[in-house]
UniProtKB/Swiss-Prot annotation:
InterPro entries: Efflux_drug-R_Bcr/CmlA, MFS, MFS_dom, MFS_trans_sf. It comes from Pseudomonas aeruginosa. Coiled coil: none annotated. The lineage of its organism: Bacteria, Pseudomonadati, Pseudomonadota, Gammaproteobacteria, Pseudomonadales. This is Chloramphenicol resistance protein. The keyword Ligase does not apply. Residues 1-9, 68-80, 128-141, 188-214, 267-279, 328-342, 392-419 are extracellular.
Length: 419
């Protein structure tokens, strides 16, 4: 172990055990209470649109918070940002379990998302600090990624069981207690891993990726994929439990099948992307989104009200989601190695804002108890991405390939930001 990492003396297994609860709890904050969503408007005396906003704000703040907590963890250290984020998450979760005010509930969801974002940033920054340039980094990222991929499958099922036994408020108490345990372990065993103070964020760096067509292509690819899943889990409780009469437990199990399709696809993509190339895989993912949307539209037009008529096309959409999310990060970061941290934050922030705002707008304009929001979102975003892919392909057709040329152009522009 190198001297710069002398403070971290844990095995790989112990490291995963210490880090993973923060990532899991941050993700469970989005998925675990989905089975209770149809009943929450009555409990809080509000509208379904307000409850939808609690989903949107959490997702958007998770991404936007990285612009704040990433540089903050570089300046103050990983440990204080992690523990501060854990404290915010605990306070918000316990408040969510107690409040009966829709306005307070929404504010606490924003606080909970900020805490989750701080924990995510600190966790992945710690992995970079400890294992930078070492083979273990790929192992631990793979383990954490696999755990996070399973949350959409396990989270709603766990939430349904807690709701059935103790009520929906206990879901947030469960999250708060889990974060208390994780933070207590971190307070005792998690040393500071940042050994060198990093200069503050140069805000001009935030503009570097937005000038690059390749960055926008893959950021929109991410927004198309994750946004499709966001719209799905936003409308699925009302559609399946309300319109189709599925029980909470049945909903959670059916929801899990889509998440499982995504997990298996993501694992398969690790072999497909190097063989076929990012541009081809991107187009394949968008094609799956469009095909799934067309099948959903057919079931709606022909009034096929069966559960299978909704969930089977969603398996295809789920494959498209996993494909898009697998290919997007590396594609967006190509050409920005020297400012990868900043560009990563911009990527997740813009992606979260785009999918949250566009998805929420579509949900608000279309009937929530139908598949039309998923259909319109998938068709719109996937078509935009495919169109932008064609533009990028034309621009990069002079020899080296579409994205290599664009990446070189972006690298040249970033080397002289004052140009």
């Amino acid at each position: 172990m190198s001297s710069k990492n002398f403070s971290w003396r844990y095995s790989l297994a112990a490291t995963v055990l210490l880090l993973s609860p923060f990532d899991l709890l941050a993700s469970l904050g989005m998925d675990m209470y989905l089975p209770a969503v149809p009943f929450m408007p009555n409990a809080l005396g509000t509208t379904a649109s307000t409850i939808q906003l609690t989903l949107t704000t959490y997702l958007v703040m998770i991404g936007a918070g990285q612009l704040l907590f990433g540089p903050l963890s570089d300046r103050l250290g990983r440990r204080p940002v992690l523990l501060g984020g854990g404290l915010a998450y605990v306070v918000a979760s316990m408040g969510l379990a107690l409040t009966s005010s829709a306005e307070v509930f929404l504010g606490l969801r924003i606080l909970q998302a900020c805490g989750a974002s701080a924990c995510l940033v600190s966790t992945f920054a710690t992995v970079r600090d400890i294992y930078a340039g070492r083979e273990e980094s790929n192992v631990i990222y793979g383990i954490l990624g696999s755990m996070l991929a399973m949350v959409p499958a396990v989270g709603p099922l766990l939430g349904a069981l807690v709701d059935m036994w103790l009520g929906w408020r206990a879901i947030f108490a469960f999250l708060g207690l889990g974060m208390i345990a994780a933070s207590a372990a971190a307070w005792r065993f998690w040393p500071e891993t940042r050994v060198q103070r990093v200069a503050g964020l140069q805000w001009s760096q935030l503009l570097l990726p937005v000038k690059c067509l390749n960055f926008w292509l893959y950021t929109l690819c991410y927004a198309a994929g994750m946004g499709s899943f966001f719209v799905f889990f936003s409308i699925a409780p009302g559609l399946m439990m309300g319109r189709q009469g599925v029980s909470q437990l049945g909903f959670s199990l059916l929801f899990a099948t889509v998440a499982i399709a995504m997990v298996f696809t993501a694992r398969f993509m690790g072999r497909v992307i190097p063989k076929w190339g990012s541009p081809s895989v991107l187009r394949m993912g968008m094609g799956c989104l469009i095909a799934g949307a067309v099948l959903l539209a057919i079931t709606e037009i022909w009034a096929l009200q069966s559960v299978l008529g909704f969930i089977a096309p969603m398996w295809l959409v789920g494959i498209g989601v996993a494909t898009a999310v697998s290919v997007a990060p590396n594609g967006a970061l190509r050409g920005f190695d020297h400012v990868a941290g900043t560009v990563t934050a911009v990527y997740f922030c813009l992606g979260g804002v785009l999918l949250g705002s566009i998805g929420t707008l579509i949900i608000s304009l279309l009937p929530r108890n139908t598949a039309w929001p998923v259909v319109v979102y998938c068709l719109t975003l996937a078509t935009v991405v495919l169109g932008l892919s064609c533009v990028s392909r034309v621009k990069g057709s002079r020899g080296q390939g579409e994205h290599d040329v664009v990446a070189l152009q972006s690298a040249e522009s970033t080397s002289n930001p004052n140009r």
